């Protein structure tokens, strides 16, 4: 594999990783703060 192809593949895989991480974070926020907020906010101590 030549260096140019490796750098291109590394760049694309990094972009894919960041996009996947963003989607996972958005879904986690949706699930834990919108759909099922009850036990998590109480565990974190936001309702005293």
Swiss-Prot record:
Keywords: Fimbrium biogenesis. This is Fimbrial assembly protein, serogroup E2. It comes from Dichelobacter nodosus (Bacteroides nodosus).
